[in-house]
Each structure stands twice: as structure tokens, then as C-alpha cells.
């Protein structure tokens, strides 16, 4: 999408895949360029370094805005606010593709490269056109493969039929434009990586610090910091290099391929492939090196590398039924062979090879998109990181105050200029600890090692801290909450008037269609004849294939086929061989029953399963039939879809009742139907799918059991007890999802669930689809009183044929026709907890037609069913927008997009697609989720603790130095070394050794470093430490044996030893140990202190050593540390007592005031006030909505969404779903107000929101003022 004005404007918005890019055009100016280089030289490169850190300043400083026609650089900002500056490249007399894929010449080609994709400028604007006539497609940047986005299917078919391929000149032009077909991860030079690492702000500050220390003759610690920093830089570069090498080895692949060029088959390297090439697929498989469309035959591929689904998939050829349409990779995915997928087998024409036409190459392929998502991951948006820099800024402000104080005091004391400069700069290095980055990583590294021991692998360590803030977990159902496979339960055949005579079964009423009883076997011994249509449909309607003698395919198909006991062969046999060869059809599969050796059925045509169509079909031929044009279509799919395709006269009246009954008990249902076809082989191979998948005859239901994994219930209850919201996001039936949700604890059986549904085609007066709220019957057998005006059970209505026989009409023999649910009538149904469930189609309706309610529904819905992969991703992003920290757990099949979008994606698949998720568990169940969260909480608390410890250490040393600067003194090098190298370094290294607590706490840890509690803790400890040091500093000067410090005169060698310095050093030693113990938090997020045995040992040893240094210092100790002996033993004991009092006061302040009062009472009080404000805020009238501004139909105010999110989180924290939580008096009030906006008459039905009030955008300036 392009803003009006196209090339004549400076700014442009571009939709590129899943990202929205904002582009700005710039060019260099001579004056700005001269000024830039002058300032860089005058500041010795510091100015250039600052611009490197702030690229936006760099652009503003060096360049001037211009039109896109004159642009030399493009400044790009993505939807995560990550920016890049890329040069515009130009080439004269070049060729580019047109929309239909043909190449044409242009006077000049302009492009830039962004994240491995080339964006080409398309300029079709005539000079006489006005600005208003510029369309989105006339002038814009497009990727090289987005240009040819309207290739007609007939063009592809024509290329395939011609069998000529590209000419050498065409290949040369396309290779020049598209480039080589290689996914190459360039290894950046080691020197470049080293330089980039060194010039980061922290390391630049370290360079500044060690420079100051060397000038101050503090060489030992400076050298230690240099060594540690160099080691850290080398390790970081090594890890980056290792990841690049690993990624390159994983994705880089080239091999020889066969193509048709200029009518000749030839073998070339895969890196020479270009779009438009005719590719020959070998019969015994290969690794696809590009995205291509299959033109003939069928191909069996394994797409686990991209989707995580290890089940082989059958790809079919593009047919002429799409002749008039434009080819679309997403819609025609069943015809596309994706790069990186493994071709297992091809079924080819006799004497011919399977052909495919190359569509996309290199990074534009689906595999290339996955690689780019790994190379350029979504930045972790976590407040802790932002607060970290703000806190460092706070420390920098303190150091600024100390800087001014030092200059003033030292000028007053008459110090030399060099000493004033060195001491004032030294105070900055003391206040902002250079070792902070290394210390901060300790907790994350330890958590990562502990996760690895539990077979949970993390490729993004920075995500571990984010896991500590997780408050909602989304689970896929199949393979995640439930077992990966399905077990056969029963079949329910349909006995209709049409097939009674065939089955030789006499019913009481021959004109009725009804279900037979449950049958657990698919054999004649169980009442089903071996050649009954239901058995034949089950045996033939599947996508199984035989590879090396072994059946492969969807596990569900495999289970059902094996249940029939039939056999399958692939090849042409019998009388149909000649007919098949005549019409050049693909070799059919031969299905044979075991009970009759003479019978066999040939699968002539297969319509593969489509998630959008929710069904698959096959055309079957029986060679025993007299007529070769007597074929049968068998279809199977979701009960709803097959019902919509069936002749109503063949469907039992209680069909929906039976379907809902099974679904509510957690069974997965598959409906089966048939249709006789009067087609020959030629027509069967060419017929369109829509022409035959209609007017079907219902055959029955297959009932499959999807068992919940043994650990699922315990894990969900564990999360519920921890007040972590659990959400099911599944592609399965809504009622099946509800049943499994109840069984695994996401919805408690004793609680009522409400279904949010829509009725297609039923519109309100403003043309929007009506939404209804219905109460669901519990999966248990508890009886719920039906109130027709309050709740409509989904299984209470039945389908009855109309008297005219013209189809179904919904009627209800038990309750009234469904009516909207009002808030008043629902009031008595709402207890302390409630659950909402919604299906994907209804969710899509609400997103498009009622966008103002999306946030509220996402805050309270617990089951999202029939969700497509893109809807799963959309849901995760929606939860993130309303301030949830989201984890997504899936088995990799159709969950990749959601796993990538979540704050913490946890994959249960060991497929290569799992590299898109930060966490991968080798144990394929959800027990890893609480482990990841608990380790994340422990790491987060450790990061908080170690940061406050390092800040406390810096401020403690700052206070000590401020006292000594007053007398123109400073700590000796030995004292600094003992503090920095022994006490601080050792405690920082062992701080993160404390393991996570064995169970999840009911409340999450604090996530705001700049919260009142955190700031009060640091400032409070600073005050306590400052007071204690002042007492010791002042008391030392009052002793009768005290000798004042004599500062050096002019350039005299400075003797840093002093009694007051020794006294402050002695008491500060205990303070550093006290800070480590105070900030080393234990339960409920980390283990007890004694669980960290190394730190316990260090604490004991350091305390004893400090006592020895203070009370019984030897001559060696005095000389090494630079201490002055304090003559009085009583005073030395006094220092120890003061340290003990300091410990008691610090621990009491942290425990009683910070933890108990601020984090306990005060936080609960604020939450209570916020909930009361939310209840008063939620609007219940139509006018509330109309007043709220919107942009393109989406509410522009996020205030209500954020408040409702906080309320939704608080409801889950206050009321446990295990039934043991306390009553939440606000749950009913919020729910009633929400219901009044969903199905209540006050909002949607009697006074709905006018659509124009939601879709008319306001000017940005007005919106800003509204906010």
C-alpha cells in the first residue's frame, strides 16, 4: 500500500509479507556531508560513534528528504520499530518482469536490498497524470517476485504443454534480474564482528573506565576488566560465528537438477534455476531447491522442514479447471512443491516425466522466508530491558552529582588539575559498574544449563527472562494436549430409504433415514457387509501411498485403512490398463478387500484434503461394473461441511444431535458421503471438484477418540494454581475443543461455558452479521436447567425436513428458536468463574465487523476452535497488544507462525521448523511449560537481584569514596582489588546458581525494575549504608588515637593509606556481603539460600575472612591491602557490631517494608482500586462506542483494552480454575457488561453501532488530541 502521491512523496507504506514497512526517501547534501566529516574529526570519532548508536540522528544529520525518484538512500522502519538505511542501486537498460511473468525492458532499474530481498522500483506513471490518479500499483517498491503476481493459470499450462522451456537469452536476462538460486548465509568477517562488538555502548564505557584506571595507577583491576571484556567479546563473536556457520550448513544446499530448455532435457546446477524453468522431478525423490508448481502427475512430499508435520503429503497437478484464474501460491498450495521439502515419490505418466514450473528461487521461497525469520527475529519487547537502561541513566545522574561534588571539594582542598580530573572521572566509573553486562548474563546462563539438563533446548537465551513474566499460555490441542494419533472408536452407519434395498435391511419405516447402532468393527461379522459403501469409502477415500512397500500418510487415514483389513497396490492392472493409457491418466491405486479376492477398486482421481474446504474426495471405479463410465465419488470431512453438501433426504433427522453429543464427549467426528457419477476416465480426470462434490448421499459417521496425554491435566492444574491463564487454540470442532478443555482442566466441569456464535446470512439492520451467546451443556452428565430466554444448547435443536422436501430448516422441538442473550437474563447464571468459547469463523466475523470487541473477547475467551494458522498468529498478537505476556506451545504442525509471534514459543517437535521457536522440548508433552516458566521466573528474579546488587555495590563504593574525597583521600589499590576482584566478582558469579523453586507461585515476580518497590529497595539500602558509613567515618575521627590523613603536596607521591579509609573499608566489606544476601531472594521463585551450596560456602568463607581482616589483621594483610592498623581492639569489635546491626536493619527493611508492605499490601490495594475503576469504566450503552474514535474500523483508543486485559488477568489470578480459588465479586459485573455488548439487546440488536461510526477515519492530528 502506498500513500497518495507515490514517487512525488517522501514517505511510503509497504506491505511485505507479514511485515509493514515504512519507507523514507533521502539523498545526501554537500553541506551536511562536509559538516558530518568535520565534526567527526574534531571529536576524534566520538560524534560518528554516537550517530552509529542512533541511526535516526545519522539520517537527519547527513541527508535531506527527497522524492523516491531522486532517492539515493531508503530509510526503512518495520512494524517492530527496527530501522535500517539501505542505498539505492541503479542500472541502465535493464529488464524486469511484468505482472504475467514476461520480461520487458526499462530505461533504468532501481532497487535496494533489505533483509536478503531485492525491492525494485516500479514506475508506470505518465508525465501528464495528476497526483490524484496515482494508484497503489503504479508507483511503489516491490520485491522481485511480487512484481509477477498475476500469472494466469492458462499461461503455466501453456508453457507445460509446449514442453519447450526458456531460451538461452531469456535465461540470461532472468538470471541477471533474479540472481542465482542460492540461500547463502554470508559469514561476516571476524574483524567486523569484533569491531561491532567493541563499539557497543557498554564496551565503549569499559574502554573509558580502564583508561581512567590506568591513569590512576589502578592497573591490576583495569587489566582484569580488560581480560574479562576481551574474553566476553571473543565468546560473543565465537557464538555469533558458530550460529552463522550452523545456519549456513543447515540451509545451504545445491544439487544437480534436470530441466527442459529450448526443447532439450539437460542437467544443470540448482543454483542456475530461474523462474519459468521447466523442472523434471525424478521418480524416486529429491530435495526441492525452489518453489515450483506441479504441472502433471502427483508427488508425495514430506514438508516437516517447513511445517513440522512429518506426515507425507500428496501434491496434485495444476488442472485446467483453474484456467481462467490467476495463480495464487496460498490458494493453490496443493499444487506447489516448496523449497526444502523432500520429494519421496512421484507417480508419473507412462513414458513421461513429472514436470513442474519454477515459481520462486533463493530467499523468496518459503524456505527462504523461514531462514530470514531466523536471521532477523522479532525483537523481544520486554520492559525489563528498557527499565535497565533507564536505571543506568539514574546511576549516571548520581555519578554526575558526584562528579560535580568531587570537582568542588578538590578545588577547595587545593588539589592539582590532573588529580581533580582523574578523581572526578573515576567517580563515574565507580557509580556505573563496567562489569554489569557480564553479571547480568549469569542468571540466564545458569537457567539455560538447567533447562538443557531437562532436555529443553533454548536458541534465544534472552527470551528466558521474558518467560518469567508469562501470564497466559496458548496450547494447540492435537499432539500437544492430546495424543498425536487418534484411536478408532465406532462407526454410525446411516440407513436411508435409498440404500435399504442395496443393504437388504428392512426398516420399520422405509421412508425414514436414520442412524444404525454403534459398530466397533468394519467387517461383515459386525453387521456391515465387506463391500458396503461405508466400508468402501473408508478403504478408498484417503491419501495413503506405498513407499518401498510400506504405507505412508496421515495417521488417521492409516488407522482407518488398517481397521478395514483391506490391501492397497499401486499400478495398472486388469481391463482398465488400455483405457488408462488411452487417456494418459496417472497410474491408479488398487484397493482390494480381503474377504473377496476377486473384488478390486481403482482410485482414478483424488481431490486432496483442504483445510479451507474441510474435506477430501476420491473417484473410484469398480472393474466388475458392466459400464466403464459408472464411477463413484466418496467424500469425507467435517460433519458440518459434508452436511452442507448432502441431499437433505439422506441425512437423519437427529444428525446434529448425534454430532453434538459425540463432540461434547471429546470425540473427533468424520462424516462420510458418496455420489454415483456417470463419467468415463477422460471426464473423470478433467472434471472440476465443485461439479461433483454436491448432492451427496450421507453414509455415516466415523467416531475417533483423541486421548488426553497423561501429564496434561496435572500441568494445566499446576498453571491454574499459579494463576496463569490457559487458552486452547485448535483447528478442531468447537464442541470437541470444549470437551477436551474440560477434560484437561482449562474449563472446569463444574463451571458453565458460553459459546459465542454467529448465524451466516442473518444480518442486523446495518448489514452486519448477528452474534449470539449460548450456554454450552457440560461435558459431564450434570443437568442444566434450560431457560429458553436465557440459553440455547447447541445440541437442543434438530433438523427436520420441510413438508415440501426442499431442504432443511432449523426447528426446535424442546426449546424456542435461538434468541439473543441479554445481560439481565444471564445474571443468575454467572458464578465466581465463567468461560467463553469461540470458533474461527465467528472470530473472523467479529474481527472484521465488530473490531471494538476483539480485545475484550481475547481477554476472557478460553477456547478458540476451528482456528486457521494465520488466525492463531493473529490471536497471539492480539493478546500481546492488550499487555499479556504470551507463551505458545505447539507440536510444530500449523503452529509455526504462532510460535514465532509469541513472546516465548515452545515447540514439542524436533523437526527443523522448531528452530523458529526459542524453546524446543525433546519430551513431547507439556510438562516443559511450567519448567520453562519457573526457570524464567528464577532467571528474572536473579536478574533483578544481581542488578540491584551491582547497583548497590556501586552506590556503596560511591558513598565510601565520597566520604574519603572530603579528606582528599581514596581507597588503596589493595582495598579496591579485594572488593572488586574477590567479593563482588565471586558473589556475582555464584548469584545465579540458586535453582528455581520446585513449584510455581500463585503470583508472578515483579517485572518492572523501575517500580516503587525496586527503587525504594535500592534507595533505602543506600540510605542505610550511607548512615552506617557516616557513623564509622565520624566515630573514627573522634578516637583519641586517631591520626588525620595528610594529602600529598603538588606532585608528591600519594600515600592512600588512612585510618578513616581503613575503617570505611572494614565496614563496607560486610555491607557487600549483606547486599548479596539481601538481594539473593529465595522462595517462592527461587530455592532457599542453602540450595545454592557454592554461594553458602562463599558467604561463610568471606565472612570469616573479613572478621579476620578487621579483628586480627597480620602484617602481611595490612601490607597487601594497604590498611592502617587501628590500635583499639574495642573499636575494631565496634565495627563488627555496626556491621551486624547494618545486616539486621537491611534485612528487616527489605523483608518487612519492601516485600511485605510494598509488594504485598500496597500492590493488592492498587489492583483492587484498578478493578473497581474498570468495572465503572466498561461502557454499556451505544453512545459510549460512537464517541470513541476509530481508524479503518479499529478502535483507536487502547485505554479500555488495556484495562480489560488487566481485569481479565486479575480474574484469573483471583479465581483459580481448579475450583479452590476465592470468590471474585467483579467477575459477574464485568461479564454482564461484556455480554450486553456481545448478545445483549442494549448494544447489538436493538441499538447496534452504525457501521459508518466504525469505519470513518479521523485525521491523525485530531486523534492525537483525542488521546
UniProtKB/Swiss-Prot annotation:
Keyword line: ATP-binding, Magnesium, Membrane, Metal-binding, Nucleotide-binding, Phosphoprotein, Translocase, Transmembrane, Transmembrane helix
This protein's name: Probable cation-transporting ATPase catp-6
EC number(s) stated in the UniProt entry for this protein: 7.2.2.-
Topological category with respect to the lipid bilayer: Multi-pass membrane protein
Bilayer-spanning residue ranges: 33-53, 190-210, 218-238, 391-411, 425-445, 951-971, 977-997, 1014-1034, 1059-1079, 1098-1118, 1133-1153
GO molecular function, one term: metal ion binding
Topology feature Cytoplasmic, residues: 54-189, 239-390, 446-950, 998-1013, 1080-1097, 1154-1267
Major localisation: membrane
GO BP annotations listed: intracellular calcium ion homeostasis; polyamine transmembrane transport; protein folding
Any one Gene Ontology cellular component term annotated for this protein: membrane
Record's catalysed reaction(s): ATP + H2O = ADP + phosphate + H(+)
Organism annotation: Caenorhabditis elegans
Catalytic residue positions: 476 (4-aspartylphosphate intermediate)
EC supergroup of this enzyme: translocase
Binding site for Mg(2+): 891, 895
Entry's family note: Belongs to the cation transport ATPase (P-type) (TC 3.A.3) family. Type V subfamily.
Subcellular location: Membrane
Region (Disordered): 1232-1256
Lyase listed as a keyword: no
Amino acid at each position: 500500500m502506498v500513500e497518495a502521491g507515490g514517487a512525488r512523496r517522501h514517505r511510503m507504506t509497504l506491505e511485505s509479507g507479514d511485515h509493514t514497512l515504512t519507507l523514507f526517501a533521502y539523498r545526501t547534501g554537500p553541506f551536511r556531508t562536509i559538516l558530518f566529516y568535520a565534526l567527526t574529526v574534531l571529536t576524534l570519532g566520538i560524534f560518528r560513534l554516537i550517530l552509529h548508536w542512533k541511526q535516526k540522528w545519522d539520517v537527519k544529520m547527513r541527508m535531506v528528504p527527497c522524492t523516491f525518484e531522486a532517492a539515493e538512500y531508503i530509510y526503512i522502519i518495520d512494524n517492530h520499530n527496527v530501522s535500517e538505511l539501505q542505498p539505492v542501486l541503479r542500472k541502465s537498460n535493464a529488464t524486469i518482469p511484468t505482472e504475467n511473468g514476461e520480461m520487458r525492458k526499462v530505461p533504468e532499474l532501481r532497487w535496494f536490498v533489505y533483509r536478503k530481498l531485492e525491492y525494485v522500483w516500479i514506475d508506470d506513471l505518465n508525465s501528464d497524470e495528476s497526483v490524484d490518479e496515482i494508484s497503489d500499483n503504479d508507483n511503489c517498491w516491490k520485491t522481485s517476485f511480487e512484481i509477477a503476481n498475476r500469472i494466469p493459470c492458462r499461461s503455466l499450462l501453456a508453457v507445460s504443454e509446449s514442453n519447450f522451456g526458456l531460451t538461452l537469452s531469456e535465461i540470461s536476462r532472468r538470471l541477471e534480474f533474479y540472481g542465482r538460486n542460492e540461500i547463502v548465509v554470508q559469514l561476516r568477517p571476524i574483524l567486523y564482528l569484533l569491531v561491532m562488538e567493541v563499539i557497543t555502548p557498554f564496551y565503549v564505557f569499559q574502554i573509558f573506565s580502564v583508561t581512567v584506571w590506568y591513569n590512576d595507577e589502578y592497573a591490576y583491576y583495569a587489566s582484569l576488566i580488560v581480560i574479562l571484556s576481551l574474553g566476553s567479546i571473543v565468546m560473543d563473536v565465537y557464538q555469533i560465528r558458530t550460529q552463522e556457520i550452523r545456519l549456513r550448513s543447515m540451509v545451504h544446499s545445491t544439487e544437480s537438477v534436470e530441466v527442459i530448455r529450448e526443447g532439450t532435457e539437460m542437467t544443470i546446477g540448482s543454483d542456475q534455476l530461474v523462474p519459468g524453468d521447466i523442472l523434471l522431478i525424478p521418480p524416486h525423490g529429491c530435495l526441492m531447491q525452489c518453489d515450483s508448481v506441479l504441472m502433471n502427475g502427483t508427488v508425495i512430499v514430506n514438508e516437516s522442514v517447513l511445517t513440522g508435520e512429518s506426515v507425507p503429503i500428496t501434491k496434485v497437478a495444476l488442472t485446467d479447471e483453474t484456467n481462467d484464474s490467476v495463480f495464487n501460491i496460498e490458494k493453490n498450495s496443493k499444487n506447489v512443491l516448496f523449497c526444502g521439502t523432500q520429494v519421496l515419490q512421484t507417480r508419473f505418466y507412462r513414458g513421461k516425466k513429472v514436470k513442474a514450473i519454477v515459481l520462486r528461487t533463493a530467499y523468496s521461497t518459503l524456505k527462504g522466508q523461514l531462514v530470514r525469520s531466523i536471521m532477523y527475529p522479532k525483537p523481544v519487547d520486554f520492559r525489563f530491558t528498557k527499565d535497565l537502561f533507564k536505571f543506568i541513566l539514574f546511576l549516571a545522574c548520581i555519578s554526575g552529582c558526584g562528579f560535580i561534588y568531587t570537582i568542588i571539594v578538590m578545588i577547595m582542598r587545593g588539589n592539582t588539575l590532573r588529580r581533580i580530573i582523574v578523581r572526578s572521572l573515576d567517580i563515574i566509573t565507580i557509580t556505573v559498574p563496567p562489569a554489569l553486562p557480564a553479571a547480568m548474563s549469569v542468571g540466564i546462563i545458569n537457567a539455560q544449563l538447567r533447562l538443557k539438563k531437562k532436555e529443553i533446548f533454548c536458541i534465544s537465551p534472552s527470551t528466558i527472562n521474558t518467560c518469567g513474566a508469562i501470564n497466559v499460555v496458548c496450547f494447540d490441542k492435537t499432539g500437544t494436549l492430546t495424543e498425536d494419533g487418534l484411536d478408532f472408536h465406532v462407526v454410525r452407519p446411516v440407513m436411508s430409504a435409498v440404500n435399504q434395498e442395496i443393504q437388504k435391511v428392512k426398516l420399520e419405516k422405509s421412508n425414514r433415514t436414520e442412524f444404525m447402532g454403534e459398530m466397533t468393527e468394519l467387517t461383515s461379522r459386525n453387521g456391515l457387509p465387506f463391500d458396503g459403501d461405508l466400508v468402501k469409502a473408508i478403504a478408498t477415500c484417503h491419501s495413503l501411498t506405498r513407499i518401498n512397500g510400506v504405507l505412508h500418510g496421515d495417521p488417521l487415514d492409516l488407522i482407518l485403512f488398517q481397521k478395514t483389513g483391506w490391501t492397497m497396490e499401486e499400478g495398472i492392472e486388469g481391463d482398465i490398463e488400455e483405457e488408462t493409457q488411452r487417456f494418459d491418466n496417472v497410474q491408479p491405486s488398487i484397493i482390494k478387500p480381503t474377504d473377496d479376492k476377486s473384488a478390486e477398486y481403482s482410485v482414478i482421481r483424488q481431490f486432496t484434503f483442504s483445510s479451507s474446504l474441510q474435506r477430501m474426495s476420491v473417484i473410484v471405479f469398480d472393474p466388475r461394473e458392466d459400464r466403464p463410465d459408472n464411477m463413484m465419488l466418496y467424500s469425507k470431512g467435517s460433519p458440518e461441511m459434508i452436511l452442507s453438501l448432502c441431499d437433505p433426504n439422506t441425512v437423519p433427522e437427529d444428525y446434529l444431535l448425534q454430532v453434538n453429543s459425540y463432540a461434547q464427549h471429546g470425540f473427533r467426528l468424520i462424516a462420510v458421503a458418496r455420489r454415483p457419477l456417470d463419467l468415463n476416465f477422460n471426464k473423470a480426470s478433467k472434471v472440476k471438484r465443485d461439479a461433483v462434490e454436491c448432492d451427496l448421499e450421507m453414509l455415516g459417521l466415523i467416531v475417533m477418540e483423541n486421548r488426553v496425554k497423561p501429564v496434561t491435566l496435572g500441568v494445566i492444574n499446576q498453571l491454574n494454581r499459579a494463576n496463569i491463564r490457559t487458552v486452547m487454540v485448535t483447528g478442531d470442532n468447537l464442541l470437541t475443543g470444549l470437551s477436551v478443555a474440560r477434560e484437561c482442566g482449562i474449563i472446569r466441569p463444574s463451571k458453565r461455558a458460553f459459546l459465542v456464535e454467529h448465524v451466516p446470512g442473518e444480518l442486523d439492520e446495518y448489514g452486519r452479521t448477528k452474534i449470539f451467546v449460548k450456554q454450552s451443556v457440560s461435558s459431564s452428565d450434570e443437568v442444566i436447567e434450560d431457560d429458553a430466554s436465557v440459553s440455547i444448547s447447541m445440541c437442543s435443536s434438530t433438523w427436520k425436513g420441510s413438508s415440501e422436501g426442499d431442504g432443511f430448516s432449523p426447528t426446535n422441538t424442546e426449546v424456542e428458536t435461538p434468541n439473543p442473550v441479554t445481560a439481565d437474563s444471564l445474571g443468575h447464571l454467572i458464578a465466581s468463574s465463567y468461560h467463553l468459547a469461540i470458533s474461527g469463523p465467528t472470530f473472523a466475523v467479529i474481527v472484521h465487523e465488530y473490531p471494538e470487541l476483539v480485545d475484550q473477547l481475547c481477554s476472557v475467551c478460553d477456547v478458540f476452535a476451528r482456528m486457521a494458522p494465520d488466525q492463531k498468529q493473529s490471536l497471539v498478537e492480539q493478546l500481546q497488544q492488550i499487555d499479556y505476556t504470551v507463551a505458545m506451545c505447539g507440536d510444530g504442525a500449523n503452529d509455526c507462525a504462532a510460535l514465532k509471534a509469541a513472546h516465548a514459543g515452545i515447540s514439542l517437535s524436533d523437526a527443523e521448523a522448531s528452530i523458529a521457536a526459542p524453546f524446543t522440548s525433546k519430551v513431547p508433552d507439556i510438562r516443559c511449560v511450567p519448567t520453562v516458566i519457573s526457570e524464567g521466573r528464577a532467571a528474572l528474579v536473579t536478574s533483578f537481584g544481581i542488578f540491584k546488587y551491582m547497583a548497590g555495590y556501586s552506590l556503596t563504593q560511591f558513598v565510601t569514596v565520597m566520604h574519603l574525597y572530603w579528606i582528599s583521600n581514596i581507597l588503596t589499590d589493595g582495598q579496591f582489588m579485594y572488593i572488586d576482584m574477590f567479593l563482588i566478582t565471586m558473589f556475582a558469579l555464584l548469584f545465579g546458581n540458586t535453582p528455581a523453586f520446585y513449584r510455581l507461585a500463585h503470583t508472578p515476580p515483579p517485572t518492572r525494575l523501575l517500580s516503587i518497590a525496586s527503587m525504594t529497595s535500592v534507595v533505602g539500602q543506600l540510605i542505610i549504608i550511607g548512615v552506617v558509613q557516616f557513623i564509622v567515618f565520624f566515630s573514627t575521627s573522634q578516637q583519641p588515637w586517631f591520626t588525620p590523613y595528610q594529602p600529598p603536596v603538588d606532585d608528591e607521591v600519594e600515600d592512600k593509606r588512612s585510618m578513616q579509609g581503613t575503617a570505611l573499608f572494614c565496614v563496607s566489606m560486610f555491607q557487600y556481603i549483606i547486599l548479596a544476601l539481601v538481594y539473593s531472594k529465595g522462595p517462592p521463585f527461587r530455592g532457599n539460600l542453602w540450595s545454592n551450596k557454592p554461594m553458602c560456602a562463599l558467604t561463610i568463607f568471606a565472612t570469616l575472612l573479613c572478621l579476620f581482616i578487621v579483628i586480627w589483621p597480620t602484617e602481611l594483610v595490612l601490607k597487601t591491602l594497604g590498611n592502617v592498623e587501628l590500635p583499639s581492639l574495642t573499636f575494631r569489635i565496634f565495627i563488627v557490631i555496626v556491621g551486624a546491626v547494618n545486616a539486621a536493619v537491611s534485612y528487616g527493611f527489605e523483608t518487612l517494608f519492601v516485600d511485605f508492605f510494598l509488594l504485598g499490601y500496597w500492590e493488592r490495594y492498587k489492583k483492587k482500586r484498578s478493578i473497581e475503576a474498570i468495572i465503572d469504566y466498561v461502557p454499556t450503552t451505544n453512545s459510549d462506542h460512537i464517541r470513541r474514535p476509530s481508524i479503518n474500523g479499529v478502535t483507536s483508543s487502547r485505554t479500555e483494552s488495556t484495562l480489560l486485559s488487566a481485569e481479565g488477568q486479575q480474574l484469573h489470578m483471583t479465581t483459580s480454575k481448579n475450583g479452590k480459588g476465592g470468590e471474585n465479586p467483579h467477575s459477574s459485573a464485568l461479564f454482564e457488561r461484556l455480554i450486553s455488548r456481545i448478545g445483549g439487546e442494549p448494544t447489538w440488536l436493538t441499538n447496534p453501532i452504525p457501521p459508518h461510526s466504525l469505519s470513518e477515519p479521523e485525521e491523525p492530528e485530531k486523534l492525537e488530541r483525542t488521546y
